[in-house]
């Protein structure tokens, strides 16, 4: 069994599979992904594989520079997105946007 390259909370699985979530915002520990990378995706909770994605773009961002477009790509409101990122990465301000598509 191959290991997963990246994981998402289970609550995001349906949005990823339906194409409603097309970016993920990560901290420095996951800043190594590059455009063109093909990644096996698993659920954070049980590491169960659920799809393969291709990275289509990467960029850096701060909490203060998040926009409505980022929120739309995450399938949530900007207020929700800022709260989710702050809850997952407390005290951090520099992040990495990974844009992707399901294969």
Curated annotation (Swiss-Prot):
UniProt-listed Gene3D superfamilies: Hypothetical protein
Active site (catalytic residues): 21, 24, 74
This enzyme's EC code(s): 3.5.1.135
Pfam families: ASCH
Reaction equation(s) it catalyzes: N(4)-acetylcytidine + H2O = cytidine + acetate + H(+); N(4)-acetyl-2'-deoxycytidine + H2O = 2'-deoxycytidine + acetate + H(+); N(4)-acetylcytosine + H2O = cytosine + acetate + H(+)
ASCH domain segment(s): 6-101
UniProt xrefs under SUPFAM superfamilies: PUA domain-like (SSF88697)
Gene Ontology molecular function: hydrolase activity, acting on carbon-nitrogen (but not peptide) bonds, in linear amidines; N4-acetylcytidine amidohydrolase activity
One GO cellular component term noted in the UniProt record for this chain: cytosol
Keyword tags: Hydrolase
Family annotation (InterPro entries): AC4CH, ASCH_domain, PUA-like_sf
Function: Catalyzes the hydrolysis of N(4)-acetylcytidine (ac4C).
Record family assignment: Belongs to the N(4)-acetylcytidine amidohydrolase family.
Name under which the protein is recorded: N(4)-acetylcytidine amidohydrolase
Source organism of this protein record: Escherichia coli (strain SE11)
């Amino acid at each position: 069994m191959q290991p997963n390259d990246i994981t998402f909370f289970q609550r995001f699985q349906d949005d990823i599979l339906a194409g409603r979530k097309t970016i993920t915002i990560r901290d420095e520990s996951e800043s190594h992904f590059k455009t063109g990378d093909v990644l096996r995706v698993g659920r954070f909770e049980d590491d169960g594989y659920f799809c393969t994605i291709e990275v289509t773009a990467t960029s850096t961002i701060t909490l203060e520079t998040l926009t409505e477009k980022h929120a739309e790509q995450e399938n949530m409101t900007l207020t929700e997105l800022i709260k989710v990122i702050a809850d997952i990465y407390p005290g951090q301000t520099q992040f990495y946007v990974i844009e992707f598509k399901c294969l």
